[in-house]
């Protein structure tokens, strides 16, 4: 990892990360001997504005599940992931973020994993408060009848008591795809989150 092209204004125009890791993803152990390759580039044209792209290639091991077999077949199932996003975060004002990610595994000419996710977020720093509104979606193109296929509208607010302690309240309204509606028996759901976050 590193930074290049110093702006002379307290930040660099380009940050990069390159990693070779064990596991089916960089943060998860795997029993095979394949390595994951991870590459990430962040372009920072202005102090509060970042554009980032990430690519991950690896091979995961099928997991034996209770009552059935694992996803894929064998110890070396290919998996590709990429994420692109941009964000503008002024600690005294506007916070805008958007991100899209795709994950795919194809074994014996069949999609075993094919998933898409995205979100758009807008917020505004008001002293110790950060109110936000967010839209996000997730699409599982293989398991279309699960609750993983949704669009969500979220309204939330974070209150920073001090640097290492925050309280957060979120309300989310989920809307499900047609196949998920049929399988679940309902077309929407609600979620309320109340969280306390500490750093030591």
Functional labels for PLM-detected ranges:
Residues 49-200:
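Outer-membrane beta-barrel pore domains
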